[in-house]
Regions:
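Compositionally biased terminal segments of proteins
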Residues: 1-207
């Protein structure tokens, strides 16, 4: 991507008033620049949930990991982020007023593919909702109950149960039963809670 296109894209991101679309555009721009160097990025955590739920949950920043095995050398990372006039360090950056965290390799346990969606400057990858759901439920109950994580998990489940996002529930069960999580009962409980609120059947509830 040449300097003129980058400048135009940054102006577009700066002018965007919708925070979710702003994150989407920034993720698209950053992904395009890293892809030119052979590294595929994926939006993770609350940032992925914000985009998947179309803003029902607002994360307030943008978190990305690399989906390819290798990341870029320090000098090359600085060079790319310099093209965006980013301020900060190797992981934590500020670009046109947005906080962008470029983390390490993505950690995924689900056997489903990353979600790929169209975006203004090229497609972006989003973390698998099966992973996101189990992870957020873990955060809800880890070291006491986190209301923020709980609200986030419920909004994700509501979008899924509303039919706007397909999820492999067998994978949710399998991931939740892994030693890294072991929180299937908590997942079943939270999904049923949202299902009851929506007056639909919980796909995790045993018949």
């Amino acid at each position: 991507m040449d300097a003129g296109k980058i400048k135009s894209a940054l102006a577009d991101v700066t002018a965007e008033q919708d925070p979710t679309i702003k994150s989407l555009k920034m993720a698209s721009l950053c992904s395009a620049l890293w892809a030119e160097r052979g590294v595929e990025l994926v939006v993770v955590g609350g940032s992925a949930i914000e985009i998947l739920t179309e803003g029902a949950y607002a994360s307030g920043d943008l978190d990305m990991c690399h989906a390819t095995r290798e990341t870029l050398p320090v000098a090359e990372r600085k060079e790319i982020m310099g093209l965006l006039d980013a301020k900060g360090g190797l992981r934590n950056w500020k670009v046109v007023g947005m906080y962008l965290d470029l983390l390490g390799p993505v950690e995924s346990f689900a056997h489903t593919p990353f979600r790929r969606i169209e975006a203004p400057y090229g497609n972006i990858l989003l973390m698998k909702p099966e992973d996101l759901l189990v992870e957020r439920v873990l955060m809800t109950f880890y070291l006491g109950e986190s209301q923020t994580a709980r609200d986030c998990a419920k909004k994700l489940v509501a979008v899924i149960l509303g039919g706007d996002m397909a999820v492999n529930w067998d994978e949710v069960r399998r991931v939740a039963n892994l030693p890294e999580y072991r929180n299937l009962p908590e997942c079943i409980k939270l999904v049923k809670e949202v299902a009851d609120e929506l007056k639909v059947k919980s796909p995790l509830h045993p018949d």
